[in-house]
Design a protein with these regions (language model features):
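Hydrophobic ligand-binding cavity/cleft-lining segments
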Residues: 4-8, 12-70, 74
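Hydrophobic/aromatic beta-strand elements that line small-molecule binding cavities or substrate pockets
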Residues: 38, 85, 96-102, 121-128, ...
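Extracytoplasmic/secreted envelope proteins and their assembly/folding machinery
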Residues: 46, 50-56, 63, 80, ...
Length: 178
């Protein structure tokens, strides 16, 4: 009887080990790991959209979970400007520091993001076509702790869904003229 219980327990731990190994292999070899991209066509000119990307008060209206954004440098929005963002999703709080790495008002903004668990590069590009503008977002994130790297195959699709929801919310508030 004891041998049977030991075999079941050993088999259970073996299955868990295989699952963890599979996630580890998937996170190490997944093409585009930590990479997100999405675009949305907004029926407004770029000049009406850009403030929603740069104004902390407006960002809170469309970025789910953004609780706070405060500048860490003076001089307004410019290359080199830094800010701190606090994201709250459920009970989980993430503190991030952002630095503007490229800026062309109403056309482009790129930001480097750092936090305890990850680093990332985000790029917003606006392209006008007639009365509408296509906003293209790309984000490339690198997870530092082993556990986050292991869970990357689960994190990235979830982050992609959040991104797509946020961009649809942005489209809605900008087009409503709020």
């Amino acid at each position: 009887m004891k041998k049977w219980i030991l075999r079941v327990v050993a088999g259970f731990f073996l299955l868990i080990a295989l699952f963890v190994l599979g996630l580890y292999i998937a996170s190490g070899g997944a093409k585009g790991k930590g990479y997100h991209e999405a675009s949305v066509v907004i029926n407004k000119p770029a000049v009406a959209i850009f403030p929603w990307l740069t104004d902390p008060g407006k960002q809170k209206e469309w970025i789910f979970g953004l609780a706070e954004s405060k500048p860490l440098t003076e001089g307004g929005l410019r290359v080199g400007a830094r800010s701190q963002e606090i994201m709250l999703v459920g009970e989980e709080q993430t503190v991030m520091e952002s630095e503007v790495t490229a800026l062309d008002p109403n056309k482009l903004m790129a930001v480097k993001v750092t936090s305890e668990g990850f680093d990332g590069d985000i790029r917003y590009a606006l392209e006008e076509a007639g009365a509408s503008t296509t906003l293209r977002y790309t984000g490339d994130f690198r997870y530092r702790p082993f556990m986050l790297r292991l869970l990357e195959p689960l994190i990235t699709p979830s982050a992609q869904r959040k991104l797509e929801g946020d961009l649809m919310k942005l489209k809605s508030v900008v087009e409503a003229g709020q």
